[in-house]
Amino acid sequence: MKNKIIELLQSSLAKLEINGVDIYVVTPKNNDNGDFSSNIAMQLTRVLKKNPRVIAEEIISNIPEDESIEKIEIAGPGFINFYVKKSSLGSVISTILTDNEKYGENNVGQGKKVLLEYVSANPTGTLHVGHARNAAYSDSLARIMKKSGYNLSREYYINDAGNQINNLVISAIVRYKQALGLEAELPEDAYHGEDIKVLGQKLKDEFGDSLLEREDLESFIRDYAVAYEMENIKKDLGDFGLEYDVYFSEKSLYENGLVDKALDSLREQGYVYEKDGALWLETTALGTGDDKDRVLIKADGSLTYLTSDIAYHKNKLDRGFDLLLDVLGADHHGYIARLKASIVAMGYKAEQLEVLIMQMVQLLNNGEVVKMSKRTGKAITLRDLIDEVGADAARYFLVMRSADSHLDFDFAVAKEQSSDNPLYYVQYAHARICSILRQASEQGDFNIENCNYELLTDEYSVELLKNLAYFPEIVAQAATNYEPHRICNYLQNLASSFHKFYNNNKVITENKEQTESYLALITAVKITLRNALELIGVSAPEKM
């Protein structure tokens, strides 16, 4: 219906010989402002040098008649509000029943090649709750963007080079020796997590004390420990519903000479200089807002973390992606300007990189704060979260707030089986519809394919029909704004509309024609609930 209104406006503008204007149509929050509204008249004020209400009148007078439109009105300074005939709203049901699992698809992405990199936790320990939020948000965003016509690839960057891996090796060797009964003390800045103890025991069980005789002990442990940690990370992410297209090794950047190539590229562009024995990147001259220049190679010859990151992002862009999306934690906020500066320095555009920042998660249980501490072995992990509330609830609660806002996650609420639990409220709507459809199947031979949608004129049916029609637009908005929480908001609204409908209408009655129209309506709701839940990686149970 929204597309039809855009076409009607385009037809009117063509008659008025007005071309090259983007037409925006929205769904007003207040029903008094119609079913759809456009500000096109106000957009044209500067061009036509007329009062927007006068322009609105001219546009309306040239809109072709359409049997689905009840009336068109001018509101406020020049909004054009469209009121759709209630009997026409039912056409969305046919669309949903035909599209089924494809309902919600749109082409706002137009095939744009996007690389989404997320979680990318160091392979030095168990994933914590901050990683869980990143995972739930990013995987949902990937699903939404794919539904919206983006050609998207999902990537995990394995930080298998650098000091954190040196610490991992030291920690693993100490735990291995301790497992053998030897005296060995874990340094204070080493990794103290339970997973490293398990790793030490695993090394002992598999190799006995034979590793102590190896000259390449550290090199062997390095490869073994990284592989072990990545296996655990992949297992946890898989159980959380995540899949990746590519796992990219930081170490491969060095092995394949990509770091040197990136440095050569920066030198060729003329944005590096030497000072105090170090090599610097002149980020302050690149217009991305960095407040000071950044070191690439230290005076002792070692590389900074930024240098390998620059090489990685050059590699991403060289692979032909139009847009890079990096999802990082709140502690990386100051990193954005220097990263953007680095790709500008290599001849790319700053807007080819978007860094999405995840804010912190606070865990609660019945309103009381649950403390986290990563290096003491007492951190609440992603695995703990899955075991405590289940993957569905964990994902839903981690996605339902905007990524740039702090999130309180209450275990007690997530486990409640009541309307106070937003996920339960949504999933129960789906299960309730499945129950009604089973009853209908047992009670009679109903045909929902050619039913009379004009019978769906009561206020609760109309509200449902409008909400159903909004779904593709909501998906497109969630994709272009990188805001998966819009899907959760939509699910709450759709579930609420359904529960109101159910409480005020008896679906299966002796009136077969009315029953069939209601069954068609709730089937469309069921499909849309399922499709929306799938976008955030949550199941749609048929029984609860």
What are these regions (language model features)?
Residues 1-90, 101, 105-544:
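Non-catalytic interaction-recognition regions
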Residues 91-96:
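Short, charged, solvent-exposed linker or helix-capping segments at domain edges/interfaces
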